[in-house]
Regions:
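A short coil-to-beta-strand element that immediately follows conserved catalytic motifs
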Residues: 92-102
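NUDIX/MutT-family hydrolases
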Residues: 127-161
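Extended, polar beta-sheet/loop recognition surfaces of beta-rich domains
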Residues: 27-28, 44-47, 95
């Protein structure tokens, strides 16, 4: 597999193959870092359940997951989580209303930021499902189950445990 980061971002010179990070360029002396891209994930309660989407793209294609995606340049994580809910579900939310629920680093170094949105009273408050290339639909889970990503499963299980405990 080709190394996407095989060249210095400052001068374009090729790094030594398999050079560890951070990488110091032998040509210009600058140091390059490989930083994680944060992912904003929406935890959207609906009538005691939890909103999930069926993924239409890899990884974890055709599995259930919490709505989410990469934070774009110029966005706060709250704006990104709100945007992802809009893109994947069609649900319009206020980024100012989202609260930090959890942050977890994935084994590959990706930082996941889970944002808790105000609960919707019933599924009737959700827009009609409109599948597209990325999302095949959505549903409301009413009990814990395995999701397409282990960290999503962990957060969903925690949410349901808190609901059961009356928290």
């Amino acid at each position: 597999m080709p190394d996407r980061y095989a060249h210095c971002t400052f001068c374009g010179a090729r790094f030594v193959p398999d050079q560890p990070w951070p990488r110091r360029c032998g040509a210009c002396g600058e140091t390059s870092y490989l930083n994680p891209k944060p992912v904003a994930v929406a935890v959207q309660p609906v009538g005691g359940g939890l909103l999930v989407v069926r993924r239409g793209i890899p990884p974890a294609r055709d599995t259930l997951a919490l709505p989410g995606g990469f934070v774009e340049a110029g966005e706060t994580w709250q704006q990104a989580a709100s945007r992802e809910l809009s893109e994947e579900v069609g649900l319009r939310t206020d980024p100012e209303a989202v609260r930090l629920y959890d942050t977890i680093s994935a084994p590959d170094g990706t930082l996941l930021i889970f944002g808790l949105f105000p609960a919707l009273a019933t599924p009737d408050e959700l827009p009609p499902a409109a599948p597209d290339d990325e999302t095949l639909g959505f549903e409301v889970l009413h009990e814990p189950r395995a999701l397409g990503f282990d960290l999503h499963t962990r957060v969903a299980n925690r949410y349901f445990a808190q609901v059961a405990a009356g928290l």
